[in-house]
C-alpha cells in the first residue's frame, strides 16, 4: 500500500517532486549468506531489531548553483541562462519557498513520506469507490477551450437549477441526488448543442460539460462551470462544501517551514503526506559511525543514538576479538606477518614507479589486516576460493590510491596498459603463494557441523559450515513441502509455519572458534 501511495503522489504532484542524482555509495546492515562447498559463511541471530540503511549523499561544490526549473543547471557568471531560468519559473512553485536557486550544502531533494495504512482494516481499504487510497481531491485548471464564452456555464446551470428538487431539512440524509444533477446537465448541454454537433466532424465533437467527475481516482472538480456561480447557490449544492480559511497573523521574524505539507481533507484517514529533504535528514544512522561531534550537535535522536551505540560496541568487540586471536595464537600472528611482508614488497614497487613519474617519495602506511579464520578449520575448495577472493580485495583496497594515481599520470595508453598488467600479474603471484602457505596450521575434529564466530553486526553471529551435506539436508531436504510438528513437554508445539526451506527437527553440532583453536587436534 505504501508503494502504491508513493507512485500516486509522484504521478499527480509533479511540481513538488524533484529528482537528483545520488551516489551509489551505500552502507548496509544485512545478513550475509555466502554459499560454497563446505566453506559457506552465514549470519544468524535475532533479526527482529530494525535495521537502518542510509545513503552517502555527498555535497555539491559551492561554485555550482542549480535552478530548480526542470533540469536547468546555472553556473556563476552565466547571466543569459540565469535570466531564462527566472522567466521560466512559475509563481505557483511553492516547493522551494520562492527560492530560484540554491547552492552548496543548501541543495534540496524532496521525497514524499507516506503514512502507514496498518491501522485501516482490509475491508475498508479494499472497498473501491469509498476509499481511493491516498489519491487526493484535485482542484486545478480543467481542459476547456480558450474561446468559451464567459457566463455560458452559469446560464446552463441557471436553466437546470429550478428543476432540481431540494430535499426537506427534516430528512436524515439531507443530501441532493447528485445523479439527477449530472443527468440534467448532460441533457441541457446536448439539447443546446445538438445542431452544431451534427454539422461538425466527429473529431471536433465536444463532450457535455459535467461540473465534477467521480471515479476511483478521486473527485476532479472542473473550474469553469462554477466560476461565475454565486456562493449562496454553491452552498446549497452537495457534495460541495466550502472551507473557511482562517488567516493567522504571523510575526515578521517567524521561522519559515523547512518542509512542505499538503493537506487533503479526509476525516477518516490521516492523509497528510510530508515532503522530506534527504540532504538534511538528521536521522541517518550509518553516515559517520566515528563522529567526534557531541550528540547535541550531530542531531541524533535518543532511539537512533542507542542503536548507534550498539553498533559501535558490536564492531569494537569484533575487532577486539580479532586482535586477541592474533596475540593469543602464534600461528595466526605468523601468517599475518607473512601477508604483511608480501604487501610491503608490492608497496616498494609502486613507490619506485611513483617516484620515477613525479620525482616524489611516498610511504604507503600499512593497515593491519586480519585474515579469514575459517581457513584454519576447513580445507574445502569453496573455502579456498573465498580465501583467495578475500586476499585480492584486501590487496586492492590497500594499493588503490597510489595505483590509480600512477595510472592517471601515465599519458601513453600503451605504458598504462603495460603497468596495469604488471601489477595484476604480481598480485596474482602473491595470492597463489599465500593460498599455498596459509594456513600454516589446520585444526580438525569429527562430528562438528559448523563453527560460530562473533560478528560485527549487533545481535548476529557468523557460521562457518564444515559439512556441506549437513547444510544441504538442513535447508534443502526432501521433506521441505511437508508440515512437521515437534512438541515440547506437551505445552509448546513448533511447526514450519510457512517457512519453505527449513526442515524440523534440526540438530546442529556447533562449537565456538576459540574452542577449536584450544581443544581440537591439529597438524602443520
Curated annotation (Swiss-Prot):
Residues 39-58 have a biased composition (Basic and acidic residues). Keywords: Mitochondrion, Transit peptide. Present with 504 molecules/cell in log phase SD medium. The lineage of its organism: Eukaryota, Fungi, Dikarya, Ascomycota, Saccharomycotina. It comes from the Eukaryota. It is found in: Mitochondrion. This is MIOREX complex component 6. Associates with the mitochondrial ribosome. GO terms for cellular component: mitochondrial matrix. Its main location: mitochondrion. It comes from Saccharomyces cerevisiae (strain ATCC 204508 / S288c) (Baker's yeast). The keyword Mitochondrion applies. GO terms for biological process: mitochondrial nucleoid organization; regulation of mitochondrial DNA metabolic process. Residues 29-61 are annotated as: Disordered. Residues 1-34 form a transit peptide. Component of MIOREX complexes, large expressome-like assemblies of ribosomes with factors involved in all the steps of post-transcriptional gene expression. The keyword Nucleotidyltransferase does not apply.
Amino acid at each position: 500500500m505504501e508503494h502504491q501511495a508513493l507512485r500516486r503522489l509522484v504521478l499527480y504532484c509533479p511540481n513538488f517532486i524533484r529528482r537528483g542524482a545520488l551516489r551509489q555509495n551505500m552502507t548496509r546492515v544485512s545478513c550475509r549468506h555466502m554459499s560454497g562447498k563446505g566453506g559457506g559463511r552465514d549470519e544468524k541471530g535475532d533479526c527482529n531489531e530494525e535495521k537502518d540503511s542510509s545513503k552517502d549523499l555527498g555535497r555539491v561544490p559551492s561554485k555550482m548553483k542549480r535552478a530548480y526549473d526542470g533540469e536547468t543547471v546555472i553556473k556563476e557568471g552565466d547571466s543569459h541562462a540565469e535570466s531564462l531560468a527566472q522567466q521560466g519559473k512559475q509563481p505557483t512553485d511553492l516547493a522551494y519557498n520562492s527560492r530560484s536557486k540554491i547552492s552548496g550544502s543548501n541543495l534540496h531533494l524532496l521525497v514524499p513520506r507516506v503514512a502507514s495504512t496498518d491501522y485501516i482494516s482490509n475491508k475498508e481499504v479494499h472497498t473501491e469507490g469509498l476509499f481511493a487510497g491516498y489519491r487526493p481531491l484535485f482542484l486545478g485548471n480543467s481542459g476547456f477551450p480558450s474561446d468559451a464564452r464567459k457566463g455560458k456555464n452559469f446560464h446552463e446551470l441557471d436553466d437546470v437549477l429550478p428543476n432540481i428538487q431540494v430535499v426537506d431539512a427534516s430528512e436524515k440524509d439531507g443530501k441532493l441526488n447528485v445523479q439527477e444533477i449530472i443527468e440534467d446537465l448532460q441533457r441541457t448541454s446536448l439539447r443546446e448543442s445538438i445542431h452544431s454537433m451534427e454539422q461538425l466532424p466527429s473529431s471536433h465533437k465536444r463532450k457535455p460539460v459535467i461540473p465534477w467527475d467521480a471515479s476511483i481516482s478521486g473527485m476532479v472538480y472542473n473550474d469553469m462551470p462554477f466560476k461565475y456561480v454565486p456562493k449562496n447557490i454553491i452552498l446549497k449544492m452537495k457534495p460541495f462544501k466550502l472551507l473557511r480559511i482562517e488567516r493567522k497573523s504571523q510575526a515578521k521574524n517567524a521561522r519559515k517551514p523547512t518542509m512542505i505539507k499538503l493537506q487533503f481533507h479526509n476525516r477518516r484517514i490521516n492523509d497528510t503526506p510530508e515532503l522530506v529533504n534527504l540532504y538534511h535528514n538528521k536521522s541517518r544512522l550509518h553516515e559517520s559511525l566515528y563522529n567526534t561531534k557531541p550528540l547535541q550537535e550531530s542531531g541524533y535522536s535518543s532511539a537512533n543514538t542507542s542503536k548507534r551505540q550498539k553498533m559501535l560496541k558490536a564492531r569494537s568487540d569484533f575487532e577486539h576479538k580479532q586482535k586477541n586471536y592474533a596475540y593469543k595464537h602464534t600461528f595466526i600472528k605468523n601468517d599475518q606477518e607473512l601477508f604483511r611482508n608480501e604487501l610491503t614488497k608490492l608497496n616498494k614497487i609502486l613507490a619506485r614507479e611513483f617516484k620515477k613519474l613525479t620525482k616524489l617519495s611516498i610511504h604507503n602506511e600499512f593497515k593491519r589486516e586480519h585474515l579469514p579464520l575459517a581457513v584454519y578449520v576447513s580445507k574445502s575448495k569453496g573455502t579456498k576460493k573465498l580465501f583467495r577472493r578475500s586476499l585480492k580485495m584486501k590487496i586492492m583496497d590497500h594499493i588503490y590510491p597510489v595505483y590509480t594515481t600512477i595510472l592517471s599520470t601515465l599519458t601513453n595508453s600503451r605504458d598504462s596498459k603495460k603497468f596495469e598488467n604488471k601489477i595484476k600479474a604480481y598480485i596474482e603471484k602473491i595470492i597463489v603463494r599465500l593460498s599455498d602457505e596459509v594456513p600454516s596450521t589446520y585444526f580438525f575434529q569429527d562430528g562438528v557441523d559448523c563453527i560460530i564466530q562473533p560478528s560485527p553486526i549487533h545481535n548476529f553471529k557468523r557460521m562457518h559450515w564444515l559439512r556441506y551435506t549437513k547444510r544441504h539436508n538442513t535447508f534443502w531436504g526432501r521433506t521441505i513441502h511437508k508440515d512437521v510438528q515437534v512438541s515440547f513437554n506437551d505445552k509448546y508445539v513448533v511447526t514450519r509455519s510457512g517457512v519453505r526451506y527449513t526442515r524440523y527437527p534440526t540438530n546442529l553440532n556447533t562449537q565456538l572458534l576459540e574452542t577449536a583453536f584450544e581443544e581440537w587436534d591439529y597438524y602443520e
